[in-house]
Amino acid sequence: MVKQIMIQGTASDAGKSVLVAGLCRLFKNKGKQVVPFKSQNMSLNSFITVTGDEMGRAQVFQAEAAGVFPDVRMNPVLLKPTNDRQSQVIFMGAILDNMDAVTYHDFKQTLIPKIQAVYQSLADENDIIVLEGAGSPAEINLNDRDIVNMGMAKMVDAPVVLVADIDKGGVFASIYGTIMLLNEEERARIKGVIINKFRGDVALLQPGIDMIEELTNVPVIGVIPYANLQLEEEDSVSLSGKNYAPDSNALLDIAIICLPRISNFTDFHSLEIQPEISLRYIRNLADFGKPDLVIIPGSKNTLEDMAFLEESGLKKAIQNFAENAGKVIGICGGYQMLGQKMLDPNQVESRQLEIAGLGLLDTETIFLEQKRTTQITGVTHSGEAVEGYEIHMGETKRGESTSPFCKIKAVNGNEETHQDGAISANKNIIGTYIHGIFDNDVFLGNLFDELLTRKNQSIYPHEIINLKEHKEQEYDKLAALLEANIQMDQLEKIMKGEKICVSTQKPAIKE
């Protein structure tokens, strides 16, 4: 019979996704067949599986940590906000519809038996399932129809461990408030608490631990020290802490336009881990500076984000940068924005029917109701072999003054040839639909060499850090950190359904 444990949090960005990934790697290293599961994920960061199904990036990185291929069953429901009031609802990798919050709140009850069936299929194939909740289980205005926190735990009778982020402050209030806002049945499901991102001497924390255990009758089974691990971040909350000022000691200054509806910002994780590269997110004109490369990322609402560029003055700044021989790369929605105009006659993404683009590429995009979701391999215009994935609802046509960026050779593992993207005559402006393009070592190394040569400097002096190898190392570090700082015997008892009591044992931080 499958063992299961559910990680819920006191708030968004408490560390749920990372904790799930770490536990997956920890159990994998112990020889267990383990998978992650999140019934419903709201995110603009998504991935395409080998079967062409769309799922949340968090469950992809958790699957990597577990040593298994990403499977859409690990994230059956994906919500991708299109604006402040509406989301695209995706079930088992395929679009169902666009819904507002009220409509979806009523509709999601119909998904419960389907979610249960999906979960059972994973349970039949694995030793352990590590479930992840969303936000906080104490969203008392939504709990009557919850399918992702206590509602999911009840569906499969999963024990819950609550994780709280002490780095933000108010950790004991958040633990107590979360538990006490739950009803009696829900409170009974919380079997343990983990305090995350702790800095300092745990002895100073112990009086608070003793008091919160007495108040809630729930044991604190771990205190995880703050660790500077280089892991993918899925929650858009994490973008608020990203740099906006360049590092003067870096060899290259790369600026990413932080669009209001930015999607797939995990595309830039490969850039973040490279030595002597300054990566910063530009939110307004004052932060633009003098970058060596500007990247326009993907967007879930390209037309409205194009309007943001116009209103913020960033459109003119990017155009001026390009006119002065600056290098600009657009990914997916960013590629569409580089063109002359974008048309949305069926209002697929926005109420706007048409908007002018940046005019840096001789291209035109029309939005279609059919989404393209594929994994691809190909060869760029300069001969680099690349792989990645596509997620878009637009069709872009090139004019005579542009050439293709990449020749696609295989789609979802099957031989298929077509052309992707566009590149300007002077080679300075590149647009592509390929997410994950920067994860290709040769392409990235050549890009750095080109940017440095343009500054009359020698080529990039470091070996490109391979993202896959780097992530494997980080997953192992994370697993070791958790094993050293969680009372694993207590966690095992929780997973077996055994009762554990508040302990007088004091946790000791281990780096």
UniProtKB/Swiss-Prot annotation:
Catalytic residues of the enzyme: C332, H435
Taxonomic lineage: Bacteria, Bacillati, Bacillota, Bacilli, Bacillales
Function: Catalyzes amidations at positions B, D, E, and G on adenosylcobyrinic A,C-diamide. NH(2) groups are provided by glutamine, and one molecule of ATP is hydrogenolyzed for each amidation.
HAMAP family: CobQ
GATase cobBQ-type domain ranges (all copies): 251-443
This protein's pathway: Cofactor biosynthesis; adenosylcobalamin biosynthesis
GO BP annotations, alphabetical order: cobalamin biosynthetic process
SUPFAM superfamilies: Class I glutamine amidotransferase-like, P-loop containing nucleoside triphosphate hydrolases
Protein name: Cobyric acid synthase
